[in-house]
Amino acid sequence: KPKYYNPESVLQKSGHGSYVETPLGEVYLVHLCARPFAPELRCTLGRETAIQKMKWTEEGWLRMYDDDNLAKEYVEESKLPEYPVPQIPDFDDFDGDELGNWYYAPRIMPQRFADVKARPGNVRIRGQESRTSLNKVSILARKLTSVYAKVTTKMEFKPETHQHSAGLIMYYDNMNYINLRKYYSQTLGQSALSIIHLENGTKTELLNTRIPVADGPIYLRLNIEG
């Protein structure tokens, strides 16, 4: 909400923290936050995680290390030895025994509908309810950490009725998304590609982008440029 926006801080909505104390006695707070874009103040990247260096005062109060009250983008690192962790891969050919833990789905575990064992080298996604549902939706997603990205996927899908669709989606929530989808077009009498844009629950189908397509493998790409 605009009345809670502080233009002096890049990180907004900071809260819901987890307390961390290292073996060296260093104190940190890991917390949720968001980075809204001006002037709309919309948090396009959703909830993010930040870390702050903290300290205990002589009176027993937990305070930020620099005695400020604004969340910082950059903090002093711990003096503990580095502990490397695997980086999230830019490419996934789904040839492992299980789905990577960097995948998410709205409100349910993605393993409930996404299977990497049925056809090695592919992920098979079982359809469920519509994209606007608050219950069971088959959206296999990765979190964006930047507003500049290129996302590409190869898909095999043959829709048989107008209720069948699959594709590539840029998803904020069930009322806000952009979906490049393959579906069965009753108008064309065959499979087609089109783009659906949902903003605050209002749906716009960009019919000028609709094109007929064959039912073989197809590549879909999404370019995000700020």
Where is each model-derived feature located?
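Carbohydrate-active catalytic/glycan-binding domains of CAZyme proteins
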Residues: 1-226
